UniProtKB/Swiss-Prot annotation:
Sorted UniProt keywords: Ribonucleoprotein, Ribosomal protein, RNA-binding, rRNA-binding
Domain of life: Archaea
GO MF annotation, one: 5S rRNA binding
Similarity field: Belongs to the universal ribosomal protein uL18 family.
Function in brief: This is one of the proteins that bind and probably mediate the attachment of the 5S RNA into the large ribosomal subunit, where it forms part of the central protuberance.
GO terms under biological process: ribosomal large subunit assembly; translation
Gene3D superfamilies registered for this protein in UniProt: 3.30.420.100
Protein name: Large ribosomal subunit protein uL18
Amino acid sequence: MATGPRYKVPMRRRREVRTDYHQRLRLLKSGKPRLVARKSNKHVTAQLVTTGPDGDETVASAHSSDLDAYGWAAPTGNLPAAYLTGLLAGQRAVDAGVEEAVLDIGLNTATPGSKVFAIQEGAIDAGLDVPHNDSVLADWSRTRGEHIAEYAESLDEPLYSGDFDATALPAHFDETREAIMED
């Protein structure tokens, strides 16, 4: 570690590799609420956050574990679950009076077709106005989980056994999406 009078210690969240302050400042200058999309291996989270002088305030949020209330029985860390989480967060934001937002992907890499863009697509379908480029959104077949169902069909039965039959994922996705849209 560098020493001396000219050495400047980075901010704590920068040292922990949790915040890109240059990106955060650009998002805050827009003056719009942020659609914060975060992912882990098992879950995804979507939040609508406004910034004020007293700090950030969460207006609406959804976690992929919230999908259980709408009948989602599949794993919660995949692309279809990310879309449904964005759809749910978008509906909650519209109910709270938010009309537009900008996407905040944090330190996630902006890979086209990824889960953070599936969250964005779900929020757009819920009625939020989020500026985007259609080339980063996944094909609808991938968003529905057809690629997961095809892979599950190619596996041998002893290798593939679980609580949820992934070959029925696209139909299950459609049912859950309708349940969220009706709510």
